[in-house]
């Protein structure tokens, strides 16, 4: 009978993804060309597909590292990630670039329209990508969630 040897797997998950500030406006209808529309409510949230993915992975018990970039206006995004147990050592803080953001209109039917500003998400350099990958092995897992990342940067 063959003996199965269990070994400890120390796989890390690197979530290389967007970090955004979401400005969510509750409106009666979507603004039309030339129209000025008053919002009924404004809420500001942490966002970005990458940030949301990192938090979900960490809450599921995975050892999660987030890599990306923010401006000085997005430091609170790091706090949110850290509170969820995500390692943020690989997030670059840029002094001269704003954090990515989304302007989201939510109408009474629950539909939305979204405008994205890439900001620091678009300032990811090949050098940053190479530096981040130095911390991981082939056995580690890499989900990438960038709406505004140019493919040549990570290829």
Predicted regions and their residues:
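Short, Lys/Arg-enriched N-terminal segments with co-localized hydrophobic residues
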Residues: 2-10
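Positively charged, low-complexity intrinsically disordered leader regions
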Residues: 9-31
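Short, glycine/serine-rich, charged loops/turns that create anion-binding
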Residues: 20, 71, 108, 119, ...
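Acidic surface patches and DE-rich sequence motifs
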Residues: 31-32, 107
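Substrate-binding N-lobe of the ribokinase-like
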Residues: 33, 37-101
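Conserved phosphate-binding/catalytic loop of the ribokinase/pfkB sugar-kinase fold
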Residues: 66, 90-94, 104-141, 146
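Single conserved hydrophobic/aromatic residue that forms the stacking wall/gate
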Residues: 148-155
